[in-house]
Amino acid sequence: PQPPAAIIANTPNNPTGAVYSRESMAALADVATDADALLVADEVYDHFDFSGRFESALTLDRDNVVVTTSFSKSLGITGFRVGYAVFPEDLVGSALTRHTLVNVAISRPAQAAVLAALRETPPSYHESVRDTVRGRIDDFTAALDDIGAEYTEPEGAFYVLARFEGFPGSVENVQRLIDDAGVAAMPGAAFGEASEEWIRFTLCTDRVDEAADRLAAYFGDR
């Protein structure tokens, strides 16, 4: 087998909501160094940290660490697909070449919109959004408790992984939730074998309480 070219770590994590400590990221950077590989830290959910422990991998100051992030999540503009990456200086030229070949460029209106948002958005906006998402997580997991479901307690991002007895996270079961309960989710199987029993719910809608009620009714009748 070929040696790895990169280790990718998403923190805060989708789908688990885990926030990796600075020490864990440093350990991953060491593993990458031993393999002559890059550590790519995907920090797209950096503004959705409920733990207070998130630190950017940029603080490691390593020459084999790349950090990527996106305004699509932090500013709530997912359709714009605007983000950036921070590369070691000796890799910037190669990164630009590959980006040009794959993406060419993002749209100018999207860039202008993000620039305006960066200039005008106060820190209180991110605090308010975090509080809103945290409240949705609390309400949703309370409903999961009521129906006896197992779930992860997210430290960041806006997802909850849940497991329902006798209802694994397959594509077929997620389709059943859509058809019979009117709740859309992602099959855990999409995230690998370790998540096959789980279903991922995204809590970025103001109808979280309604979704929780529908799940309670659906699994209460099973």
Regions found by a protein language model. Name each.
Residues A32, L144, L177-I178:
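A generic structural signal for well-ordered alpha-helical segments
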Residues P1-P3, P15-I77, E89:
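Active-site pre-lysine segment of PLP-dependent enzymes
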Residues R176-A185, G192-R222:
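PLP-dependent enzyme catalytic core of the Aspartate aminotransferase-like
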